[in-house]
Every structure is written in structure tokens, then in C-alpha cells.
UniProtKB/Swiss-Prot annotation:
Protein name as catalogued: RNA polymerase II subunit A C-terminal domain phosphatase SSU72
Top-level class of the enzyme under EC nomenclature: hydrolase
Record keywords: Hydrolase, mRNA processing, Nucleus, Protein phosphatase
GO MF, one annotated term: RNA polymerase II CTD heptapeptide repeat S5 phosphatase activity
This enzyme's EC code(s): 3.1.3.16
UniProt keyword NAD, yes or no: no
Assembly behavior: Component of the cleavage and polyadenylation factor (CPF) complex.
Amino acid sequence: METANGNAGSAATAQNGQQEDASGFKLKFCTVCASNQNRSMEGHLRLAQANYPVISFGTGSLVRLPGPTITQPNVYKFNETSYDSIYRELEAKDPRLYRANGLLNMLGRNRVIKWGPERWQDWQVGMPRVKHEKDQGSIGMEAGVPDIVITCEERCWDAVVDDLLNRGSPLNRPVHVINIDIKDNHQDASIGGGAMVDLADSLNRAAMEERDKVGAAVFDAGGAASRASFDERVPEVLGEWQERWPGLPSTWTLSWF
């Protein structure tokens, strides 16, 4: 069941979730869970608040949220249904139930992050995200090409890796796909969001060091040769992170856009 803590960010945060940041280079991230509702959106929010460019997706065939019984889920289409419309529908159906199980809090948070749930398999990598300028984390993601994809469970990782293989690497650009096994509930999603930011900070430090060595223009081009030294460091960085977060098993692979 997907729930969330309803944290919509501080009042000091800009509409797109990012404050003015003087710390320099930032890797670009993508977070992925099944329905683009709980874990990926918690990660999306936390990374945006940490001034990382970020987008998020789900890998399921449909958006599924808990209903009045286990056999009566609330089902919606990706890319066509806004978080606000889902919020209003559930509030009209049974406000007590959906407030008690955390769905209204979750959707209230989500609708200030971006318009609605997006499906990974429908996403055109590298397509400019000109209609997403109000999304939190949108600054720096205008070109629509992340450096790191973080999934929240193994089946989502499998879906992302398989989809990238099927796409045939048209951009010939490396992307690190990392799975963090996060249980789909309120508390673990919050913990997982903090863990994502910790990992992002560690990866970004390594990237900045390697970028300084090869030059900003070369590194930022995103080619395999220009980022080889950073790519080689990712497993070590992830291993050090795993020691700090032993309760969140991780998996990694280098894939291609």
C-alpha cells in the first residue's frame, strides 16, 4: 500500500522546489516506483529540496491505490490523471477512510510536486520537458536526460533495465540504474527519501572531482569516454553508502540511454 507523510516542503522553497544554489555542479536524478505515488515521490521531493534536478516515474501498467477493500483498489491511468483530481475524487468518496490511511496526505503532497503520475515506459528520453517547468526539481532537467536512475524495488529495477535494453541506446549515453529496496509504507518511504539524498550527495561529490579532472565541458557532454572515471567510482561510492544504510539493500548496473 502506498502512503506518505504529506510533507509539501518548506515555505522558503521556490515553486519548483529548488532554491538558489551556489555549490556548483549537480548530477541529474530520476526516481521510480510502481505507481509514481509514494516512494518515488518522496524521493523526488527530497532530492528537489536538496537542489538536485529530478524527475520521477512509475513502471506499473496502471496507477493503483488502496480502496475500501483489498479487491476494490482505486485505479487510474498514467499521464492522463492529475494528483489533484485523484485527491478530489477520493475525498468525495470517503474522506475519513482516505485520510486515515494516508492517501489524502500523500496526494496533497504530490499535487504540489508535479501535475500527475508519469509512466516510465511511455517516457521519451531526451525529449525536452517544456511543459514541466513548474515541477519541483525541474531546473536542470529541461533536456530530460538524468545521470542516475533510482528505483525503489527489484521489480521496478528489472522493468527499467529491460526497457533500456529494448530501446537500443539511441543516445549512446551511460546511465547508472540503482535499486534501493524500500518497503511501500509511510515510514520506510520517508527513511528511503533521506537515504536517496545521502547517496546523491556522495555520488555528486565523486562526479565533481572527476569533472574537475577532465574539464566541465567534456564531462557535461555525457559521453562514455568523458565519464569513464566517474562510472568506475560508482560501485565504490555505493558500497560505502550501503555500509551507512545496511537496512536498505541495493543493486546497481550501468545501462545506456
